[in-house]
Each structure stands twice: as C-alpha cells, then as structure tokens.
C-alpha cells in the first residue's frame, strides 16, 4: 500500500489494531484506512502512540499536545508560544511526557488534574520512559537526566557524559540506557552503577535506536548497514563488538525499527529504500525497492508482520513482510 502525502512524514507507528498512523509536517494525522485529522496549526514535530494504543499523540510548533483518533483530535495540553518537539508515552503507567525547550512536562491519562513540570539547564532533545513507566529519561547537553515521573519536588539523577545527547532508549529490562550523541557515536550506561559504555565507530551520526529480540539486541542507524549491538547478559555490549547487517556502500541507514520480542529489524535508507531482516539468519527482505527521498519515519508491527514508512517528500507506505 503506497501513499503520496503533501508534506514531510514526521513519524509513523502502529496502533493496537495493527493499523499504521502517520504524522505529517503540515500538522495532519493520516490513518491507514484513509481517515485524516487536522491536529495542529503548523508542523508536527514529534509523535508517539497513545498509551491506550488508540491513535497518536503529537507535539507541534503551535505549542499543543494533541491526541488524534480517526473520529477527531483532542487537546491534551498547550504551551502557547513554544514548540513541543519531544513526546513520550507509557502504556504501563498511562503517563505522557513532553518537552519544550528546557521544560519537561508530565500528564496522566487517568487523571486530567495531574501535572508535573521539571526544569533542565539546557534544551531537552528526547524523552524515554523506562519499561514500567515510573522513571523518565531526558536527553540533554552533558548527559541524560532521570526523573521519577510522579514526584513533584525532587533532584534528578544524572548520567553524565560530555557532549550533546540527542536521542535515548531504555533496554526492555530497564538495566541499560543508551543515548545517541551529536558526534558519530552512542553512549550507554548500566543504570544501577552508572557504568559507562562507549559505543563508537560510526561513519555518521546514529540518530535512530531500537531494542529488539526481548532486549538482547540494539539496532541503530548511522552506517551503511544496520549496526547491531549485543545486549544479552549483565554487562550488555561492554567488551563486545557490534555487527553490521545489510551493508551497501552507496547508501546509509537513517531509520531503524525493531520488533520488541522478535529478532526482526526494519531499515530505512537515505535513498528512500526500505527493507527488513531476520537477524537469526540475516535474511534481508526488500519492502520498498524504488529509490527516492530519504526515509524520515519507520515502524514495525510487534509481530514483525508489517512495516510502515514515510519519506521527506511525503511518500509513504505499508508492506507485509514475506516471512
């Protein structure tokens, strides 16, 4: 199934029914069945699935956080004059987090009156809930700050490493936290003792991260193929080498998506192509062979049955994986 939207595709995800939902740079949310919602007066800057699995949560340059379902949009929060450019949600706790500049905000889907705000020294670039949804990681300059999402007055835990951290991801067991940096490298920590893990060797910036296979592997962009780090055991990737899958000299992987419980990864390339791979046998399955504008959004269904993608020129699609 192919689409030709009129704007850049900011994000794509699968809802609880297994249907793709696209967030666009013109402020609209598009559903696989053709439904469209005008969610924002401006561009969507970040979007994730709602904790309920129904529809999409999006932050925009209009300062609004919006929950879009096929029936229409619902405003969750508003920060007039600001850009909401990082959003996270936890199905486990029902909490929603979003940031604008140095301010991080938390809301509760079960309690409309609940509100928390946390200040940072520098701009927050990305957010991620730990698996239980109680702690929240905020990637910023100098490291990642950790907050207990429900506690009002607190000092954050700080995982420190010099440089600008632009994306972050928790391992499914909550033992490790990995960040992408402005440099051509990742940095990770074993959270319990703050043990540092340097993960370098990338030819470009690895901006896209995805744990898969029950947390035993971490897939990243930033190279000519998908870079896969081993995370099994108590020490994660420490002292181990990464593998590279689907290497092509003429293209770079810019987006990755992983099936949480299965060894399947999807890759979006800077030349517009998309493929998926079963890492147990390293069999690459082409999903979009036509070249075009760079892939900007990518998602794989939890059962690894389908992949959805979007590109910077508005081209998008959904494909079945021939397993």
Predicted regions and their residues:
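WD40-repeat beta-propeller superdomains and closely related acidic/aromatic-rich repeat-like regions
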Residues: 1-323
């Amino acid at each position: 199934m192919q689409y030709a939207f009129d704007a850049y595709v900011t994000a794509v995800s699968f809802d609880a029914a297994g249907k793709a939902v696209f967030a666009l740079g013109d402020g609209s949310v598009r559903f696989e069945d053709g439904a469209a919602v005008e969610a924002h007066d401006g561009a969507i800057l970040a979007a994730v699935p709602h904790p309920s699995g129904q529809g999409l949560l999006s932050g925009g340059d209009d300062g609004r956080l919006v929950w879009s379902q096929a029936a229409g949009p619902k405003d969750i929060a508003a920060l007039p004059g600001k850009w909401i450019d990082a959003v996270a949600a936890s199905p486990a706790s029902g909490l929603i987090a979003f940031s604008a500049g140095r301010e991080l905000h938390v809301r509760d889907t079960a309690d409309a009156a609940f509100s928390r705000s946390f200040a940072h020294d520098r701009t927050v670039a990305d957010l991620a809930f730990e698996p239980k949804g109680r702690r929240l990681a905020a990637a910023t300059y100098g490291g990642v700050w950790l907050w207990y999402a429900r506690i009002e007055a607190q000092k954050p835990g700080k995982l420190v490493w010099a440089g600008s951290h632009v994306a972050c991801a928790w391992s499914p067991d909550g033992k490790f936290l990995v960040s992408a940096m402005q440099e051509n490298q990742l940095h990770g920590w074993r959270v319990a003792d703050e043990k540092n893990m340097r993960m370098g060797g990338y030819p470009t910036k690895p901006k896209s991260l995805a744990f898969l296979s029950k947390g035993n592997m971490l897939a990243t962009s930033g190279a000519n193929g998908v870079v896969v780090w081993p995370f099994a055991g108590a020490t994660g990737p420490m002292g181990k080498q990464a593998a590279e899958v689907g290497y092509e000299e003429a293209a770079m992987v810019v987006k990755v998506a992983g099936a949480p419980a299965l060894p399947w990864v999807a890759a979006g390339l800077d030349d517009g192509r998309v493929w998926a791979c079963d890492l147990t046998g390293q069999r690459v399955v082409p999903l979009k062979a036509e070249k075009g504008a760079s892939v900007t959004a990518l998602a794989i269904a939890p059962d690894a049955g389908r992949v959805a993608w979007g590109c910077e020129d508005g081209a998008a699609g959904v494909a079945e994986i021939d397993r």
